[in-house]
Amino acid sequence: MSEERAARFGVGDDGLMDDRTTGESRHISAWINRSAADVYRYASDPSHLHEWAAGLAQGQLTRVGETWVAQSPLGEITIEFTPANDLGVLDHIVTMPSGEPVFNPLRVVPAGEQWSEVVFTLRRRPGMSDDDYTKDAAAVTADLAALKRILER
């Protein structure tokens, strides 16, 4: 990982997370009755994001260079996705309307041939209230439930 990219993803020189996180995180997951390849193929396509990630995007995304621009409940955001890979890694950086970058680890983990677990790591940002952290967790839970509904129909 280049130094610039590592810095964008919140990794310090020592390989540890920098001060953009409090060190508190929650793993929120959904089990989906579809292969990991199917889940990854759908979830990694930015054109589908507004269908299942209402907490992030409220309409179609527009590509601008290496990033995507979307309207979110908080205003206009930009999203930088991890390059396509065979490991199920869907990490992304959301740059908030304030300019604050937020790193979001997201994985599609195979569980046999027809099941997968989608795991989102929600990191508590400095200064985030208990109420806001709980609301973020609820939004992620709802987004993963929507992804499950779409892929299992």
Q: What kind of region is each of these model predictions?
A:
Residues 34, 44, 76, 139-142:
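Generic recognition of short, well-ordered alpha-helical interface segments
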